[in-house]
Amino acid sequence: MRHVAVIIPARYGATRFPGKPLADLAGKPLIAHVVERAQRARGVDVVAVATDDDRIVRAVRAAGGEAILTGPAATGTDRVAEAARKLAPRPEIVVNLQGDEPLIEPEAIEAVIGAMAGGARMATLARPLAEGELERTQVVKVVTRASGDALYFSRAPIPHRRAGGESPLARAHVGIYAFTAEFLETFTALAPGRLEGEEALEQLRALEHGYDIRVADTGYRGFGIDTPDDLERARALLAAGA
């Protein structure tokens, strides 16, 4: 079995919701919920939060989790890569799990880890599109080859369907990633691509440079906390047993 680390990048100064990782959610910091759910996933050897903020480090450790202090980073993936270098033993598979997903399902983490079987160097998840989501730019769409590797990710409705209506070929991307430790270093060393800049989608960097991304199915819809209103929704969902 390969050594697997789930690393959760977190920063304090989010523009829309400063201090978000430490926001109270059912009596504990939001980031603690992400850690606890990741710890429930089968096949995970270590879960760690990667942050450049001492307040987050203290909160995670007070909740019984592991936190790694990093330097300033351009992206969450850069922060994950730095944290992975500091782990001992060095993980063979690194899962990049967003720190604003307190309702993450352990099965989704297991699915992206499972997608790394068979020699994949990078993997992510996708789910069926709900009605009306194809046209929404907030929902990232992905289309894949017959092999299951990604052809393209876009905020636009892809593919265009000449017959009209919504295409059954596109799925909604769920932003959880797994990398081999070696490819994580390769990825973070790549120059940002033009398509990545146009779409504001970091994963396009791999495709632009000719690397494959395996895409596995999940039933998890994804629920990131971007605003205080999102936090209220999460509180209601947790109270209802989510």
Curated annotation (Swiss-Prot):
What CDD domains does the record point to?
CMP-KDO-Synthetase
- Transferase listed as a keyword: yes
Catalytically driven reaction(s): 3-deoxy-alpha-D-manno-oct-2-ulosonate + CTP = CMP-3-deoxy-beta-D-manno-octulosonate + diphosphate
Q: Which UniProt keywords apply?
A: Cytoplasm, Lipopolysaccharide biosynthesis, Nucleotidyltransferase, Transferase
UniProt entry tagged with the keyword rRNA-binding: no
Q: What class of enzyme is it?
A: transferase
Q: Which Pfam families match?
A: CTP_transf_3 (PF02348)
Record-stated family:
Belongs to the KdsB family.
What the protein does comes down to: Activates KDO (a required 8-carbon sugar) for incorporation into bacterial lipopolysaccharide in Gram-negative bacteria.
- The name of this protein is 3-deoxy-manno-octulosonate cytidylyltransferase
Q: Which organism is it from?
A: Anaeromyxobacter dehalogenans (strain 2CP-C)
